[in-house]
Design a protein with these regions (language model features):
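N-terminal secretory signal peptides
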Residues: 26-67
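Compact alpha-helical subdomains of small soluble proteins
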Residues: 58-127
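Sec-dependent signal peptide recognition
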Residues: 5-15
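N-terminal signal peptide c-region/cleavage motif recognized by signal peptidases
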Residues: 21-23
Length: 127
């Protein structure tokens, strides 16, 4: 990740950490791993969706326009999603279905792991 992406990700993590620290999940406290699974799972799914758009040839501007229409999304989270879009479009568009599927899976996994690694560091003292 680039410096601006790291700064944006830290803001995202701080917001999510604040939400997680007061959250109650199904009448029991959410554990650190539960929080990581929920938040980073959502990031992975979003990254998969964006990379799928990339691999089918959708224009980056369309993805940005859809993101900009999200009125209820907090700005730091929206900015982080924008960085995911930028990162996806820095990757090549593949011509074969097999390579496209691999690119989608690898990108989703990469974004999930980036999120999980950052949360592990930020939440190290909790639980």
């Amino acid at each position: 990740m680039k410096i601006s992406e790291i700064k944006m990700f830290r803001i995202f993590i701080i917001l999510c950490t604040a939400l997680v620290s007061v959250n109650v999940y199904a009448e029991k406290k959410m554990t650190k791993n539960d929080a990581i699974d929920v938040i980073c799972g959502g990031i992975g799914e979003y990254a998969e969706s964006v990379m799928t758009s990339r691999q089918v040839g959708e224009n980056i501007a369309n993805n940005i326009a859809v993101l900009n229409k999200q009125k209820n999304m907090e700005e730091p989270i929206k900015s982080y999603h924008r960085e995911i879009i930028y990162e996806a479009y820095r990757e090549p568009k593949w011509s074969t279905k097999e390579n496209q599927d691999n690119a989608i899976t690898e990108f989703s996994n990469k974004m999930y792991m980036t999120c999980a690694d950052a949360f592990q560091k930020e939440l190290a003292g909790l639980e």
